[in-house]
Amino acid sequence: MFLFLLLLSASRSGEESPSGDAVPLATGGLNRKSFPEGFLFGTATSAYQVEGETHQDGRGPSIWDAFVKIPGKIANNATAEITVDQYHRYKEDVDLMQNLNIDAYRFSISWSRIFPEGSGKINSNGVAYYNRLIDYLIEKGITPYANLYHYDLPLALEQKYQGLLSKQGRFCGLRRVLFQTFGDRVKNWMTFNEPRVVAALGYDNGIFAPGRCSEAFGNCTDGNSATEPYIVAHHLILAHAAAVQRYRQNYQEKQKGRVGILLDFVWFEPLTSSQADNDAAQRARDFHVGWFIHPIVYGEYPNTLQNIVKERLPKFTEEEVKMVKGSIDFVGINQYTTYFMSDPKISTTPKDLGYQQDWNVTFNFAKNGTPIGPRAHSEWLYNVPWGMYKALMYIEERYGNPTMILSENGMDDPGNITLTQGLNDTTRVKYYRDYLVQLKKAVDDGANLTGYFAWSLLDNFEWLSGYTSRFGIVYVDYKDLKRYPKMSALWFKQLLKRDQK
C-alpha cells in the first residue's frame, strides 16, 4: 500500500496499466535527458535461460543440460528445454523492446548451438538463428550486445577435456567464428558473463554446473575447492585476454567494435567502523570483483589473494601479463545488492581450504536488528540502492575509471504469483527508480558509464530456482508462453520516451 500511495503522490503519465486502468508511472524526475548524450538503456537475457529448443536444430548439449537432469538440483526438477522459447519467438520479443523504447539488447550466444561438440563442425542452423536475431534487432533500431559465454559450456568439452580445468584453446575457435560471422553488425562484444560465478559456484561449492567441490563444502562426487576455482578463473582470464588480443589484431580496425567482460559486484560495506570490519569488507571486494578486474587492469592478482591463497594461486608468465593487462575496451558491472561484512575473529587455520573459506569474513544482512534493505523473493537479494553508487565509484577510483556499462540490475518476485499480481509490480518499479537515481549520481560524480541493462526482459529459467523466481519486466505465462508487459516495463517506456524536454 505504501508503494502504491507513493506512486499516486507523483504526477501521472497517462500510460495504461496492464489491466487497462490509468496508472502513475513516476520516474523520480528521471528521463533520457538525465543521462549523457548517447547513453543506452537495454534489457538482458542469456541463451540457456530464454531460448529453449535445446535438443533440436543441431544444437549439442551443454553442461547445464546434464546438470538439470540430476534430481534435486533445480527447483521442481525444472529444465530449460522450452523455457520461454525465444528461439521461435524472437521477433515478438524484439517488437516488445521496440515498443518499450529500449535501445539495446544484451543476449548470449549458445556455444553448443554453434559448435555442438565444442569445436570442429559448425551447426549452420545455429548460425542462421543468430543472424536472424541480429538482423531483426538492427531492423527495429535496437543495438545488439553479444556475450560469448554465459555459463553454458558444451558438454563434450567437459567430458573430453575436463572443461574449464583444461587450458585448451577451443574458445579461440568459437570467438573466431563469431567475430567473423557477426562482427559486421555486432559492435559490442562481451567474452564472459560473471566468470567469478562460474569458478565459485561450479568449483567451490558445486551448486552450479559442472558441480565440482571438496566434500567439506558441498554434495559433489569430485573436485577440489582449494585449487580448482583458482585454476578455472585463471583459464577464463587468459581466454578472455586472448580473445581481446585477437579481436584487436584481426577485426577491430575494420569492424570498429569493442570487447569487454561482465563482472558481478555485490557491494560489501563494513558492519562497523572498526579496522577489522573494514579489512574484512576489503578482503571481500578483492576476492569478489578484484579477482578478475585487478589482473585485467594491473596485470596481477590483488595482494590480498596473493598473500592468502599463496601457492594455490596460479601465476601469469611475463607474456601472459602483457596480454592480460589492459584487455578491456569496457567492463560490464552486474550489480543487484549489498551486504554488511564483519571480521569473524578466527585466528586458527581452517582444516579444509576453499575459495569462500579464504575470504575469512562473516556476511551480515542486518545491522543492530535493522535489515540492510527490503528483501526481494530471492533470499540473497536486498534492495540497497546506495550500494550501486558505492560499487561504481569504487571501480572509478580504484581501477582508473574504465568505460563501464551497468550490465545487469533487477529484482525478482515469486514464480507462483498470478498474472494480475505479476503485472502490478510496484516494488520492482521502486527498485529500478531508486537504483537509477544512484546510477545517475555516479555518472554525475564522474563514473564513465555509457549504458544500463535491466535484468531481465522476460521471466525465464532462473538456474537453481527454475521457474520459481521471476526477474522479468515482461510476465510470461509458462503454460502458453504469452508475454504481458508489467508495470515496470511501462515505467521504462515512460522513462525512455524520446520526445521529452
From Swiss-Prot:
Which segments cross the bilayer?
none
InterPro entries xref list: Glyco_hydro_1, Glycoside_hydrolase_SF
Which SUPFAM superfamilies does this one have? (Trans)glycosidases
EC number in record: 3.2.1.21
Record flagged with keyword Signal: yes
Tell me the first and last residues of the signal peptide. Answer: 1-14
| Residues reported to bind a beta-D-glucoside | 49, 150, 193-194, 336, 408, 455, 462-463, 471
**Catalytic residues (positions):** 194, 408
Does the keyword section mention Signal?
Answer: yes
Which GO molecular function, any one, fits this protein according to its record?
beta-glucosidase activity
User: What are the disulfide bonds?
Assistant: 213-220
User: What's the catalysed reaction?
Assistant: Hydrolysis of terminal, non-reducing beta-D-glucosyl residues with release of beta-D-glucose
Kindly list the biological process annotations in GO that this record carries.
carbohydrate metabolic process
What is the enzyme's main class?
Answer: hydrolase
Sorted alphabetically, the keyword list is: Disulfide bond, Glycoprotein, Glycosidase, Hydrolase, Signal
Glyco sites are at 77, 219, 360, 416, 424, 448
Q: Which family does it belong to?
A: Belongs to the glycosyl hydrolase 1 family.
PANTHER family xref list = BETA-GLUCOSIDASE 43 (PTHR10353:SF161), GLYCOSYL HYDROLASE (PTHR10353)
Can you say what this protein is called? Beta-glucosidase 43
Where does this protein come from, organism-wise? Arabidopsis thaliana (Mouse-ear cress)
